[in-house]
Curated annotation (Swiss-Prot):
GO terms for cellular component: cytoplasm. InterPro entries: Mur-like_cat_sf, Mur_ligase_C, Mur_ligase_C_dom_sf, Mur_ligase_cen, Mur_ligase_N, MurCDEF_pg_biosynth, UDP-N-AcMur_Ala_ligase_MurC. GO terms for biological process: cell division; cell wall organization; peptidoglycan biosynthetic process; regulation of cell shape. Coiled coil: none annotated. The keyword NAD does not apply. It comes from Rickettsia felis (strain ATCC VR-1525 / URRWXCal2). It is an enzyme of class 6 (ligase). This is UDP-N-acetylmuramate--L-alanine ligase.
């Protein structure tokens, strides 16, 4: 029996408990299940935006993990981030309560839907949001489960009335290859999550399975500007693949005539599909978010819209309705006519893309780029140490804080101070500095910010909370 049919029978599905319910992926699934009428509760170590939102819907939230939290539950949902020593997992095992992985629950929600799964090392959340906007503009009402807060919805998940479901597919532990999607998007593939995959080739193999597991009537959408994705596309012959890019002249969908500023990007699109005679040009598409990487994200959404025959008007209107995603180049403050941006970038490739966007804007304003970065996880820093040394070239000044551990134990020699020392010693940048305390960033901004500057606060840890407090802190100093 399928989960979505369970409520139609006389059987009762009792309480579903989410361990780590405040996580963005877990909170989205919990919200959808709640909206479907299931009894949902969960626990997390700290209160955050997601736990507060879920509580406002009447979902019970426990702060802290404890055996008694699952006293009256029938199912426990976990993500790969939950340690096996968690007391709630131990209690569930002791009492033989079924433990369901997050991806398995997501797959169950997708099973009877025509589903779009958005994967890739970077850009998943924005792309998922853009695809959803096009579906809505086409008169469809999709269910959406995203990896970030969609600004015009104030949530990362919402229940639709149509047979379509759009979901961000997390590749961190290979469970995404089992998601029953009809349309698969791959934005890019970079060395990431190697603590799980052990080597890059295994990660690439997982993405290949993600495409080949599609039904024969489905299709994939892939960015061939990325050389690893291009090679993957070349190796797959048994599934339909629509390609996109900016630099790839052989892509089916190409952006050109690009203009970008602090608030938006405008571009034209050339569409050359094998099942369509001739070439179609769509002029002056505007997305209300800056950056070349976001243009690529929008091309993935356009590919889906074209294949599903949404029409040019719906595509343009959909992008006009897009209001961005929380923590994706989000303006949080101004000081001395400089703009402070909060961004989720925590991988070297994401940092490059974010700083390139900031530099493009700052150059037009005769300003400079000040990067304040909080590394996330010792394991990521260890695997990508050399890449982190080279990813700050578009910043004029760099400030790197201590590593946000995210529950990991320190690794000998893997420190932010060591990274700064290597950047300076190898002459990759002459303005790299170690920031002993995150609070010291206030003085950095006061001492260095001037008109036209872009101050970029980056990381996946608690730097976002700090960035969102800056407006008040800086205002008190003017």
């Amino acid at each position: 029996m399928l989960l979505l049919e369970f409520k139609k029978t006389n059987q009762t599905l009792e309480t579903i408990h989410f361990i780590g319910i405040g996580g963005v992926g877990m909170s989205g699934i919990a919200e959808i299940l709640h909206n479907l009428g299931y009894k949902v509760q969960g626990s997390d170590l700290v209160e955050n935006y997601n736990t507060k939102r879920l509580e406002s819907y009447g979902i019970k939230i426990f702060l802290g993990h404890a055996e008694q939290n699952i006293t009256n539950v029938s199912y426990v949902v976990i993500s790969s981030a939950i340690n096996s020593n968690n007391p709630e997992i131990k209690e569930a095992l002791e009492r033989k309560i079924p433990i369901i992985r997050r991806a398995e629950m997501l797959a169950e929600l997708m099973r009877l839907k025509c589903s779009v799964a958005v994967s890739g090392s970077h850009g998943k959340t924005t792309t998922t949001s853009l695809v959803a906007c096009l579906f809505e503009a086409a008169g469809l009402c999709p269910t959406v489960i995203n990896g970030g807060i969609i600004n015009n919805k104030s949530t990362n998940a919402y229940l639709g009335s149509s047979n379509y479901l759009i979901a961000e597919a997390d590749e961190s532990d290979a469970t995404f290859i089992h998601i029953p999607s009809t349309i698969a998007i791959i934005t890019n593939i970079d060395p990431e999550h190697l603590d799980y995959y052990k080597d890059f080739e295994t990660l690439i193999g997982a993405f290949k399975s993600f495409i080949t597991n599609l039904p024969f009537y489905g299709f994939a959408v892939c960015c061939i500007d990325h050389k690893i994705v291009r090679k993957l596309v070349d190796d797959i012959t048994e599934r339909k693949i629509v390609t996109y890019g900016i630099d790839s002249e052989d892509a089916h969908i190409i952006a050109f005539n690009i203009n970008t500023d602090i608030a938006s990007s405008t571009f034209d699109v050339k569409i050359s599909l094998p099942n369509v005679l001739g070439t179609t040009i769509i002029e002056k598409i505007t997305i209300p978010t800056p950056g070349r990487h976001n243009i690529l994200n929008s091309l993935a959404a356009i590919a889906v819209g074209i294949e599903l025959d949404f029409g040019i008007k719906a595509i343009k209107n959909g992008f006009n309705n897009f209001k961005g995603v929380k923590r994706r180049f989000t303006k949080v403050a101004e000081y001395n006519k400089a703009v402070v941006i909060d961004d989720y970038a925590h991988h070297p490739e994401e940092i490059k893309a974010t700083l390139a966007t900031a530099k493009n804007i700052a150059d037009k304003q005769n300003g400079k780029v000040i990067a304040i970065f909080q590394p996330h996880r010792y394991s990521r820093m260890q695997h990508l140490f050399d890449d982190f040394m080279l990813c700050f070239n578009d910043a004029d000044m760099i400030y790197i804080t201590d590593i946000y551990a995210a529950g990991e134990e320190p690794i000998e020699g893997i420190t932010s101070q060591n990274l700064v020392n290597k950047i300076t010693k190898n002459k990759h940048h002459d303005q790299a500095n170690f920031l002993a305390e995150l609070d010291d960033a206030v003085e950095v901004i006061i001492d260095n910010a001037s008109s036209g500057d872009m101050i970029i606060m980056m990381g996946a840890g608690n730097i976002s909370s700090f960035a969102n407090e800056l407006d008040g802190r800086l205002s008190s100093r003017t």
